[in-house]
């Protein structure tokens, strides 16, 4: 990835219109990589819009089905796919009610409190409440259960949120592992993310923090706070 400090609109930067690159936080780019070699495999990207991870999956050679329930957000994904010259099957649907699969791999970037984006949105702590986070955690648990349904036996499921709250990350996945015998953790190996091995937890999950990667030029440092767990369907 490349970082730059430039004035003006993103669309006016060199290479954007030609589809040479897309905008994505460094932390947000990690979950898709943890699916491994997905060339020729069927992959469902759930809650996909605006599509940075969909583009990653398509570029890696997967047969991607991108699902999101918001048509306007899917329109952005469609535009991004066209701009970079990649292809994916697009479905506007509620993941909880969507019938499809099973897939070789599933990526679920669940709706969350987005507290991990605090370095870019410093107002986040004043806009989120404990009750709101609890409600989101319930939604995430339902979406994760559905993602498990959509993963074939032997397939891989990556769950992630851009949240710093354990209720939307570590605690939620621990509860799912206790509750559902169909899944087991597939620990992330430090060698899979060379250079940022310190983000791998003792349990084999991934936890990035906004304070990581400091730089003398503040606009060039840091990354979003993300939680990522990799699971395997039995």
Regions found by a protein language model. Give the residues of each.
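S-adenosylmethionine
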Residues: 1-234
């Amino acid at each position: 990835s490349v970082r730059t400090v430039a004035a003006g609109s993103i669309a006016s930067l060199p290479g954007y219109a030609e589809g040479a690159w897309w905008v994505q936080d460094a932390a947000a780019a990690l979950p898709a990589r943890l699916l491994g070699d997905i060339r020729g495999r069927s992959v469902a990207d759930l809650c996909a819009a605006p599509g940075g991870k969909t583009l990653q999956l398509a570029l890696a050679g997967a047969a991607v089905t991108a699902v999101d329930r918001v048509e306007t957000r899917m329109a952005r994904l469609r535009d991004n796919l066209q701009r970079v010259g990649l292809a994916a099957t697009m479905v506007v649907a509620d993941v909880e009610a969507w019938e499809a699969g099973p897939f070789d791999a599933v990526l679920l970037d669940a709706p969350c409190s987005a507290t991990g984006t605090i370095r870019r949105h410093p107002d986040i702590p004043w806009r989120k409440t404990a009750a709101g986070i609890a409600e989101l955690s319930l939604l995430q648990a339902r979406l994760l259960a559905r993602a498990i349904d959509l993963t074939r036996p032997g397939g891989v499921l990556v769950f992630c949120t851009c949240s710093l709250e354990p209720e939307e990350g570590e605690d939620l996945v621990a509860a799912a592992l206790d509750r559902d015998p169909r899944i087991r953790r597939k620990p992330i190996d430090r060698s899979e993310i060379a250079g940022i091995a310190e983000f791998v937890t003792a349990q084999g999950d991934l936890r990035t923090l906004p304070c990581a990667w400091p730089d003398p030029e503040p606009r060039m440092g840091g990354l979003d706070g993300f939680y990522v767990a990799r699971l395997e369907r039995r």
